[in-house]
């Protein structure tokens, strides 16, 4: 009988362990919390952690318990949620009262099944330890021999009492083990839900699960003690509450389609609106404040500016302070140094013997100008305009007529440049008036900033959605650093 009881208890404990391993992720809320979940549209009595958090958020939204101005504040006084929390209000930035309530009102379904299995096993042991009705009848027929009955009772009582002591110790160990497993299991469910991504109404980790994670996020983390929670400001992230589900799905699908369609148009839009800057230049600009201004990062490879005497990183070709070009930059390239060091042609001094000689009345040719870099030549073309350099053959006898021709040509070029600038500005203005390139509904008021350039191609909602999803700029495929809203007056 003792061996049968032990085997029954082992089988019951094995089934309890098997049930607990299968149903770890399910929780069962208590009655008061279950009423709140049912009021928010939940069905059933067993949920996952994500479902519990979802319906709690739906309850807060339906009842409009949050403040319209400061939407991270939830006022639950006089409501079922306030009675359950035991407070009048709480902030989303410090959700510790909410987590304490969930710990008290959530029970893992696995622990319920294991308790049932344990109760069944203890009941079997209890029925086996006490005599049955047949055994009592058999004892009544043998009552005539009291000594024999006493000896049999002693022989049965001794192993049974030992078995009871051993079973009671095993039961205490099992209950203690189950309580520890239940607590760790609930903590694990909270932590797994917390890492998976939070809605707007719950921020931060559990106080007992505050473990620093190096996930590359920009959230500021303080001391990870028991009273500390990871908090990020999402008070302006309620814009999606006013949008329908179909609109959100439509925008998400159009973002993927627009990324594939606009790859062929990147060259056209970038040539019209922005000057193409290399990726290395943007990286240098973003790291300039951290790399160049640190006094402790001195090395033998740094070069000193000849203008302001500042030490700069060896990878920089311009001085960070005065923006002067580094001396002997790429000195091995003869063409580049020649173009940068080319000076104006110095006039040949006339001999004193030639003074007083009349200039002949004839035509003469002027030598070809020295080839200069394209940018520098265009900049010096207007302020240093010389009639002798712009005309191939000059009639020295008719200088007044040539000057009139040159002045008329200058006026025509100025008029042409002004017309070209006006047409470009009109094209840019018409592009701004077009709707968003992703949703094609809202105006283009979301300015996508990356480095020292930005693009105004989407609305503010779509631009912020791209920033949150980690997508790149739809115009130039660069990483989005900041999104601002533009108001066109």
Swiss-Prot record:
The keyword Transport does not apply. CDD domains: MDM4, mRING-HC-C2H2C4_MDM4. The gene is Mdm4. Residues 131-166 are annotated as: Disordered. One of its GO terms (cellular component) is nucleus. A motif (Nuclear localization signal) lies at residues 441-444. PROSITE patterns: SWIB_MDM2, ZF_RANBP2_1, ZF_RANBP2_2, ZF_RING_2. Belongs to the MDM2/MDM4 family. Residues 25-108 form the SWIB/MDM2 domain. Found in a trimeric complex with USP2, MDM2 and MDM4. Interacts with USP2. Interacts (phosphorylated) with YWHAG; negatively regulates MDM4 activity toward TP53. Interacts with MDM2, TP53 and TP73. Region I is sufficient for binding TP53 and inhibiting its G1 arrest and apoptosis functions. It also binds TP73. Region II contains most of a central acidic region and a putative C4-type zinc finger. The RING finger domain which coordinates two molecules of zinc mediates the heterooligomerization with MDM2. It comes from the Eukaryota. Keywords: Metal-binding, Nucleus, Phosphoprotein, Ubl conjugation, Zinc, Zinc-finger. Residues 246-331 are annotated as: Region II. Phosphorylated. Phosphorylation at Ser-367 promotes interaction with YWHAG and subsequent ubiquitination and degradation. Phosphorylation at Ser-341 also induces ubiquitination and degradation but to a lower extent. It is found in: Nucleus. Residues 131-140 have a biased composition (Basic and acidic residues). GO terms for biological process: atrial septum development; atrioventricular valve morphogenesis; DNA damage response, signal transduction by p53 class mediator; endocardial cushion morphogenesis; heart valve development; negative regulation of intrinsic apoptotic signaling pathway by p53 class mediator; negative regulation of protein catabolic process; negative regulation of transcription by RNA polymerase II. This is Protein Mdm4. The modification Phosphoserine is found at residues 179, 341, 367. In all tissues tested. The short isoform is expressed in a variety of transformed cell lines.
């Amino acid at each position: 009988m003792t061996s049968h009881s032990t085997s029954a208890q082992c089988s019951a404990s094995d089934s309890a362990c098997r049930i607990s391993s299968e149903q770890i992720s399910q929780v069962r809320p208590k009655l008061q919390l279950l009423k709140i979940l049912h009021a928010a549209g939940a069905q059933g009595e067993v949920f996952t952690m994500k479902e519990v958090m979802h319906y709690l958020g739906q309850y807060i939204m339906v009842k409009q318990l949050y403040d319209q101005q400061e939407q991270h504040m939830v006022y639950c006084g006089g409501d079922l949620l306030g009675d359950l929390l035991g407070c009048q209000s709480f902030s989303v930035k410090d959700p510790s009262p909410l987590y304490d309530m969930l710990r008290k009102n959530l029970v893992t379904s696995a622990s319920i099944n294991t308790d049932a299995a344990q109760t069944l096993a203890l009941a079997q042991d209890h029925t086996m330890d006490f005599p049955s009705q047949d055994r009592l009848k058999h004892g009544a027929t043998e009552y005539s021999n009291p000594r024999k009955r006493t000896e049999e009772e002693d022989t049965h009582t001794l192993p049974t009492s030992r078995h009871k002591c051993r079973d009671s110790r095993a039961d205490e160990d099992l209950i203690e083990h189950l309580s520890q497993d239940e607590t760790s299991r609930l903590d694990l469910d909270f932590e797994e839900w917390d890492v998976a991504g939070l809605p707007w109404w719950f921020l931060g980790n559990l106080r007992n699960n505050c473990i620093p994670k190096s996930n590359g996020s920009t959230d500021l983390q303080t001391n990870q003690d028991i009273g500390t929670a990871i908090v990020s400001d999402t008070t302006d992230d309620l814009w999606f509450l006013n949008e329908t589900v179909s609109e959100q799905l439509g925008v998400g699908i159009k973002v993927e389609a627009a990324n594939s369609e606009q790859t062929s148009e990147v060259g056209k839009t970038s040539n019209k609106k922005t000057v193409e800057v290399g990726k290395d230049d943007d990286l240098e600009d973003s790291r300039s404040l951290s790399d160049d201004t640190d006094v402790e990062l001195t090395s033998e490879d740094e070069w000193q500016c000849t203008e302001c005497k500042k030490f700069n990183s060896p990878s920089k070709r311009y001085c960070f302070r005065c923006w002067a070009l580094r001396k002997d930059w790429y000195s091995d390239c003869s063409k580049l140094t020649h173009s940068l060091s080319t000076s104006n042609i110095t006039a040949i001094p006339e001999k004193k013997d030639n003074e007083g000689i009349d200039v002949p009345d004839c035509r003469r040719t002027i030598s070809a100008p020295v080839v200069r870099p394209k940018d520098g030549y265009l900049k010096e073309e207007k302020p240093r305009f010389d009639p002798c350099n712009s005309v191939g053959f000059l009639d020295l006898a008719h200088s007044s007529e040539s000057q009139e021709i040159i002045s008329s040509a200058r006026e025509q070029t100025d008029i042409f440049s002004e017309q070209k600038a006006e047409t470009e500005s009109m094209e840019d203005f018409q592009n701004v008036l077009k709707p968003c390139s992703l949703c094609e509904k809202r105006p283009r008021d979301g300015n996508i900033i990356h480095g020292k350039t930005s693009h105004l191609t989407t609305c503010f909602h779509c631009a912020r959605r791209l920033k949150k999803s980690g997508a790149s700029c739809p115009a130039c495929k660069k990483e989005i650093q900041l999104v601002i809203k533009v108001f066109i007056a």
